[in-house]
Swiss-Prot record:
InterPro entries: SDH6. The keyword Metal-binding does not apply. It is a peripheral membrane protein. One of its GO terms (cellular component) is mitochondrion. Keywords: Acetylation, Membrane, Mitochondrion, Mitochondrion inner membrane, Tricarboxylic acid cycle. It comes from Arabidopsis thaliana. This is Succinate dehydrogenase subunit 6, mitochondrial. Coiled coil: none annotated. It is found in: Mitochondrion inner membrane.
Length: 142
């Protein structure tokens, strides 16, 4: 009973190292998110300009942008269909609202998985393309 330190307290460094290894991809964006002055907003024409100017990362970014359409479509279909089903059988507004939210999340996830296989995103490094775009935008906006 002399050592009253908790399990988490004893193993804090190990847990911190474990999770920092698994979440290390967040460090790719740190220099863009933790700035003194934020980057200015960009438009679709800026993204199209980057896609045209970078032969390596441009097509990857274009494919990643196309994948968003799958996610949005899946979210809309999932949200509306589950909310309609819940409303039809329960007539409960809060149940329909929760079904709408849950169906939207499920639909987005399912849509992204469809995009992953259809557009073969698993073969591309979309994060590197996004980081290259952010670097390009940072240089261009200075």
């Amino acid at each position: 009973m002399g050592d009253s330190e908790s399990f988490v307290g004893k193993n804090w460094n190990g847990l911190k190292d474990f999770w920092s290894d698994r979440l290390s991809f967040f460090e790719n964006y740190t220099r863009f998110t933790k700035r003194d002055a934020p980057l200015p907003s960009w438009s679709s024409s800026d993204v199209e300009e980057f896609i045209a100017s970078d032969p390596v990362h441009g097509p990857t970014l274009k494919t990643a942008r196309e994948a968003v359409t799958f996610g949005v479509t899946g979210a809309a279909l999932g949200a509306v269909s589950t909310a309609a089903f819940a409303w039809k059988y329960s007539r409960s507004p809060h149940g329909a609202a929760l079904s709408f939210l849950g169906g939207g999340v499920f639909g987005w996830t399912f849509g992204q998985e469809v995009a992953n296989h259809t557009l073969q995103l698993y073969k591309l490094d979309t994060m590197a393309a996004q980081v290259k775009f952010m670097e390009w935008w940072e240089r261009k906006s200075q």
